[in-house]
A protein has these predicted regions:
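Short glycine/proline- and aromatic-enriched beta-strand/turn motifs that initiate or cap beta-hairpins
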Residues: 31-77, 213-259
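Outer-membrane beta-barrel strand-turn architecture
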Residues: 32, 73-75, 116-118, 163-167, ...
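Outer-envelope beta-barrel architecture signal
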Residues: 32-38, 82-88, 119-123, 168-172, ...
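Residues that define the transmembrane beta-barrel architecture of outer-membrane proteins
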Residues: 34, 59-65, 84, 102-108, ...
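Outer-membrane beta-barrel translocator/channel fold
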Residues: 36-55, 72, 76-82, 117, ...
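Residues on the lipid-exposed face of transmembrane beta-strands in outer-membrane beta-barrel proteins
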Residues: 40, 67-71, 108-114, 125-129, ...
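Transmembrane beta-strands of outer-membrane beta-barrel pores
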Residues: 42-48, 71-73, 92-98, 127-133, ...
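Predominantly the C-terminal beta-signal and adjacent terminal strand-loop region
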Residues: 160-207, 219-225, 335, 339-351
């Protein structure tokens, strides 16, 4: 029985271990003069029922492991000191949803760890590409309304308490871990899956370099004297309505916004945008025919106009952007009038 258990674990995690070893080799080769650590976390939790129609997918407690290879910033850039010497690197995540319809997910991407309170509180952000073993299939897996495609985006956020041993060579940590999987409506169905987990983990410092430690996490940030900037943005891509196999259509989102940089870390935004999502044209016609009791006019305008506020957090030339908006013009009221957007931007010019 013990042999069978070992073979089962070996089969599931072999690809994970080999992939992480490759990531470790790429990141750490020739760089052991700087603090490099290998981090392991075990996860177990629950699927969040964030939408209706997911009850049949919640049959157990998902569990998984996350392996990361991380390098601590050395303070060579000013922003690294401002953020208390964060870690950055790569991660590999495996999650078993304990459900025959969902199967398992593998994900890999980039990770950053930020520290507070003498590096005892860790805030983790990781984002990458995920692959599911059980995507939607009309013939073999028609009940999977969460993953309409084999590949999708993966976003992870964690908060943990970390304590150090043996001259900071080894650390133990425990906390909460949130994971999100979605293909961004590029292919239906796409309810996506969110899990909230408890995690326990270990980290091992592979180098002999000391860990940079800031005396205080509170820094004085000088207010920016930059003027208000005005911007035009055009976004485009492909997406699909919630009707399975209805086909992908192009979309064009045209926005105008003003932004004011408050300091070297933060910027506020205020703007408006026009949404031209072409899949809505066919979707409105479909709804008018399929649900005559709703009395939907097939010629209803598919366009939408929104107003939004936004926030940018800068890490040198990279900025994390978050926006929340409200549709002030939405003739076809299928979605709720509130929307949000999260993204990453890179500035080629100096800010």
């Amino acid at each position: 029985m013990y042999v069978l258990g070992f073979l089962y674990i070996h089969k599931i995690y072999m690809r994970l271990i080999l992939s992480c070893f490759l990531l470790f080799t790429i990141l750490s080769f020739g760089q052991l003069n700087k603090p490099i650590s290998l981090e392991f976390n075990y996860l177990k939790g629950n699927i969040l029922p964030h939408k209706k129609g997911l009850d049949h997918l919640i049959t157990g407690h998902p569990e998984g492991v996350m392996l990361s290879v991380l390098k601590q910033s050395d303070g060579s850039k000013e922003w690294q000191k401002d953020y208390n010497y964060p870690e950055y690197g790569a991660y590999f995540l495996y999650q078993d949803f304990k459900n025959d319809i969902l199967g398992q997910n593998y994900a890999a991407g980039f990770q950053s760890n930020f520290y507070f309170l003498k590096r005892n509180i860790q805030f983790k952000v990781a984002s990458g590409i995920a692959m599911t073993t059980h995507p939607y299939d009309k013939e073999t897996n028609s009940k999977n309304n969460a993953f309409g495609s084999k590949f999708m985006a993966n976003i992870n956020i964690g908060l943990a308490y970390k304590t150090y041993f043996f001259n900071k060579k080894i650390a133990a940590q425990t906390g909460f871990f949130f994971s999100h999987y979605s293909n961004g409506r590029t292919k239906s169905p796409n309810s996506g899956i969110n899990t909230i987990n408890l995690n326990i983990g270990l980290a091992y410092n592979l180098s002999t370099s000391k860990i940079n430690k800031k005396d205080s996490v509170v820094t004085s940030i000088e207010n920016s004297k930059e003027p208000i900037h005005y911007n035009v943005v055009v976004r485009s891509g492909l997406n699909e309505s919630s009707v399975v196999n209805s086909g992908q259509h192009s979309f064009y989102h045209i926005g105008f916004f003003a932004n004011k940089k408050l300091n070297k870390k933060t910027t506020l935004q205020l703007g408006t945008e026009l949404f031209l999502s072409n899949f809505y044209k066919d979707f409105i016609k479909y709804q008018s025919i399929a649900y005559p009791n709703k009395q939907i006019d097939a010629n209803t305008d598919y366009k939408r106009v929104g107003v939004f506020i936004g926030y940018e957090l800068f890490f040198d030339k990279v900025a994390v952007e978050a926006q929340a908006g409200y549709y002030v013009y939405q003739p076809f009221k299928f979605d709720i009038p509130i929307y949000d957007r999260i993204g990453i931007k890179y500035y080629f010019n100096k800010k």
